[in-house]
């Protein structure tokens, strides 16, 4: 809590936290151990707060990306303090048999659940971790560029350290 309080005191206006309020912990529902109003806690730290629920009034679930975007755009207008956005969700949605189930917190979903999730989302359940070739090639170029930049920095630092042994120590 000290870090969050410090962020509020320092008015870190470019910091945004999106809190996934799925109401589940390893032992069951969070209400057995978590009673405070999280938004009021962050307001007390000096943060701007807002919330959106993906759980609809009728109990159905819809990830409202447009609504979340509006909440984030509104928060973006706040520049004098950090932002805390609470998003009410269902853990493991839309995994068949695991949605809103404490067993999905902190443990593997399992082969059958992953297969069902892939089918639900329209992915081939027999393909593990598909990566687009163009995206992979781009990631490799970025990695190469990073390695080159790191080597150049190491060389420049070594020259500087040799020329400035007192400061480099």
List the model feature ranges, each with a label:
Residues 1-143:
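Glycine-rich ThDP/TPP pyrophosphate-binding loop and its adjacent helix/strand module
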């Amino acid at each position: 809590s000290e870090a969050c309080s410090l962020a509020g005191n320092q008015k870190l206006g470019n910091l945004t936290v999106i809190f996934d309020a799925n109401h589940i912990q390893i032992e069951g529902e969070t209400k057995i151990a978590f009673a405070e109003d999280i938004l009021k806690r962050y307001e007390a730290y000096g943060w701007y707060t807002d919330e959106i629920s993906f759980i609809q009034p009728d109990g159905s679930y819809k990830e409202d990306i447009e609504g979340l975007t509006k909440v984030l755009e509104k928060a973006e207008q706040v520049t004098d303090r950090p932002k805390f956005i609470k998003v009410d969700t269902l853990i493991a949605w839309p995994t068949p048999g695991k949605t809103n189930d404490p067993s999905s917190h902190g443990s593997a979903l399992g082969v059958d659940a992953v297969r069902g999730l892939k089918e639900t989302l329209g992915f081939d359940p027999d393909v593990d971790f598909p990566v687009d070739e163009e995206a992979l090639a781009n990631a490799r170029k970025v990695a190469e560029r990073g390695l080159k930049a790191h080597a150049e920095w190491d060389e420049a630092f070594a020259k500087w350290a040799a020329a400035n042994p007192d400061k480099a120590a």
